[in-house]
Amino acid sequence: MLVDTGLGLISELRARLGWAALLQIVPVTVVAYNLLWFIYTSFFSSLRKIPGPFLARISRVWEIKKAATGNIHEIVMDLHRCHGPIVRIGPNRYDFDTMEALKIIYRIGNALPKADYYIPFGLPSSPNLFDVQNPARHSAMKKQVASLYTMTALLSYEAGVDGQTIILKEQLQRFCDQKQVIDLPQFLQYYAFDVIGVITVGKSMGMMETNSDTNGACGALDAMWHYSSMMAFIPHMHAWWLRLSSLLPIDVPIKGLTEYVEQRIIQYRLKAAEFGDDDALKGENNFLAKLILMERQGTVTSTETQQAVGLNIGAGSDTTANALSSILYFLYTNPRTLRRLREELDTHVKEDPIRFQQSQSMPYLQAVIKEALRLHPGVGTQLTRVVPKGGLVIEGQFFPEGAEVGVNGWALYHNKAIFGNDASVFRPERWLETKGNLNIGGSFAFGAGSRSCIGKNISILEMSKAIPQIVRNFDIEINHGDMTWKNECWWFVKPEYKAMIKPRAA
């Protein structure tokens, strides 16, 4: 609708004025608008005293330039260290790093809507559970698939995860025997993809066994996050670009993964049709089988099935892979912590792989996971919400309707006022101590409130399986070779390093 209106307006102006006049008017209008906005925000707005970069006061160019460096998470942390709990990152965008702001902005009741920033993370004509902006619509969509994420459902996926965790151990042993330097974060993404493939469509993608990016899925997701995280700053251009790309011979990176998902959906529908009833699917412990059953019962549509499957694979694999990579990095570069975790595992774990319910009763393991997610939250950008009618008071400052506000997880989790002077230190023990509101922010790595990640327990299931398996059997020499620890933020903050797998020494 917006694309058609915009194209119609341009055509009408061109017809009335001609191209020459139109090309003169557009830049003058843009300059005039930004000048007037600067005058308003500098001298008349109630938010004029909020600190931040000068360019961010009048334009989104500052945020776009910083995001394009792949280092926006570090830059926003530095802004908060310099200016305090509220900083301006755009003409109408404000970032926070406090628990008070988190509880207000991501409240469960009367939830704030997501900003237009999220539009490029899906299709404008068919919003998914992640990018849908309206809270009521999100609630309705979430109810449709909530049964797939219950604890009962989670435990039904465990056997499939066990199978892939055993393959993980076997492949790491092969790297160990060959004394091979590997891109460990990349291999952990293969593990995450294979696991989420089994959970979602009932079949591994075979990445670990081939040590390769089958279907180009990893590369496709990287390209998608690059695109969406930058297009998010000009979200209404997303629909224009999609229309343009459909008319040009442009390669679509996600094509291989999309075809894989579509093939599995077709196979399951044919399987259900062949038997003529639901019995063929009831014994299958994966998302797709359950969704096809829901389709046949009329509770979800075929489009919603495809959306749910695609979102589960896309978001689930990167979230888990990045978390596993950071957990192992912090563990194997902190020998004291590694020793304490091994003591807990050696004392209490007899099964191989560990049972999920047992892992949940192991306090130090869970503290290690929480602490790694604190130091390295998966998402490096602000989780943006729009202030509703009537405005909001956050950190003592009134924000009018329409202002875009949010908390950056990296800034929050590195805030010394919350986590102490050792906020930048990997110390899992902090989660075993009782310090007031510390645990309130403990799950913000997966978002907060009604819009927190619906699949977070699946990610925790994978972590709780893989980490004990690796720690009990292997030593890892981090930064072996010419690649040191590096992070790049394209929505997700992806760790990069190389490692050598070795037999456990003690």
UniProtKB/Swiss-Prot annotation:
Can detoxify the phytoalexin pisatin from garden pea. Pisatin is an antimicrobial compound produced by pea in response to infection by plant pathogens. Gene3D superfamilies: Cytochrome P450 (1.10.630.10). Keywords: Heme, Iron, Metal-binding, Monooxygenase, Oxidoreductase. SUPFAM superfamilies: Cytochrome P450 (SSF48264). It comes from Fusarium vanettenii (Neocosmospora pisi). CDD domains: CYP57A1-like. This is Pisatin demethylase. Belongs to the cytochrome P450 family. Pfam families: p450 (PF00067). It is an enzyme of class 1 (oxidoreductase). Its EC number is 1.14.-.-. Its cofactor is heme. Heme binds at residue 453. One of its GO terms (molecular function) is oxidoreductase activity, acting on paired donors, with incorporation or reduction of molecular oxygen.
